[in-house]
Amino acid sequence: TVCTKPPMLSISVRPHRLSYEYIKESMEFVVNMPHSNMTKAVDYCGVKSGRTNDKIKEMGFTMKECRQINASYIDECPVAIECKVKQIIPLGTHDLIIADVLCSHIDESLMDEKGKIHFEEANLINYCHGEYYPMTKKSLGSFGYSVRKKKKKK
């Protein structure tokens, strides 16, 4: 999250990547958030070029049309976020792309009756410095928990 009001996020992409060309041309993109069972497919898609490979077909992904942008998202991903580019900032090896979040697609099994999303149930993965890590733990705390007063028992 870059900003909550309005909702925004950022990604970094190397300018020589095919996905970068698509983003620059359309000024739209989708952030698909895969679960750990998709790690091998995610790695394959990160290594192989879409210029020479039909990665969607090869990985057997099911594509669904987005609601607010002219793109598709991967139905197998428990979370997908539709974005509209606001700004692109060249940094060096990567360009920082800041985007408005237009809408999201979230597996309903991850939401409770109040609409809260339980990301720990999604078994999402994180990529950091060339390694894939599971995100399976519960939250370590929510904003302000260090100073929040404890509720008194009745």
What annotation goes with each model-predicted range?
Residues 1-154:
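Basic, polyanion-binding surface patches
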